[in-house]
Amino acid sequence: MRRTAPLALALILAPACAAPAPAADATTTTPPAPTSETASETAPATPTTAPPSSHHGHGAPVADREVQRADERHLKNVTQLTFGGENAEAYFDHTGTELTLQVKRDGAGCDAIFRMNADGSKQRQVSPTMAKGGGRTTCAYILPSKQVVYASTHGHGPGCLDEPDRSQGYVWKVYPEFDIWVAGPEGENPKVLFKSDGYDAEATVCHKTGRIIFTSDKTGDLELYSMNADGSDVKQLTHTPGYDGGAFFSEDCSKVIWRASRPTGDELADYQRLLKMHLVRPSKLEIFVADVAADQTLTKTVQVTNNGKANFAPYMHPDNTRLLYVSNKGDPKGRDFDIYMVKVDGSGEERITTNPSFDGFPMFSPDGKKLVFSSNRANGTPGDTNVFMADWVD
């Protein structure tokens, strides 16, 4: 995921649960987030403004950069949790007290998986470090057992792998080396949970049962699947040509929400041609929601958006009547991504964020009282993406 325009599209389109985020221009971090090897701990973040260290790599005082916007009426007491580099896709555990997130900073060539407390303290890396044979990673979630599930390429060798071939235009690579892994709470004893001959990633978890939903192209198309927390009972959930990905369960696990492309004609031919090269062109994605049947398949699928733009990172409110998603539909140039809220039937849409750069990857806490999201706001260095926590106000 990368988080800035025009790289913002990379953010919705990098291998991730939700989508891409803008790319950072620098990786200076203040304060530095400790890795699992240092066993150190960061202090909790301070509401509304960044910590009193006041400089994030380019000398601008924290007070000069806006974290809380007066016209974002649903967000109060906005708190910055990370400071510098690329930090995105922060997801709550079932208790609402911990988060996993993707982090790229301090000169790293690709994202690593971190875990931290919901106040921003105790940041540490839980995916293998490059020094220990780590690879490219994406999309992590905490199971009810406290184990961490994520996708990684490190089973096929260390390193970040090559970037996608830009001669094909703006494309995102669905690395066939991605497999789904599970590890202990601090990243210990990682093992493969699901592996096919192709791309297996974007795993998220039902907080009630631990069932996992993910994306795979093992049948030749990018489809949604689900499985038990131990890797058993794998079921294919979608069967329509196009990229189905970035799926999440609702809090009660009765619904699944995701983003998908539905190309036809020449666009379908282009999609299938690129997929044979492990590439996806992610400029047109819509939001879908479906009920989860007793046999764990999907039923009563509804298309929520139909605007032909890049829509991604959907997440259900715990009341199951509303959802959040991220879109560039408000910017004629397609570079500014904001968070929107809409009813499940597509009515009553409202813009939630107004920051004139990137806001994305929203997730409600299990009780619906908090919202965690990623943003380019309050940047210490141009291109930084950080994680923010806010009180949600209806």
What is each stretch, according to the model?
Residues 51-76, 178:
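Blade/loop signatures of beta-propeller domains
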Residues 83-86, 103-113, 129-137, 151-179, ...:
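A flexible loop/linker signature enriched in serine peptidases of the S9 family
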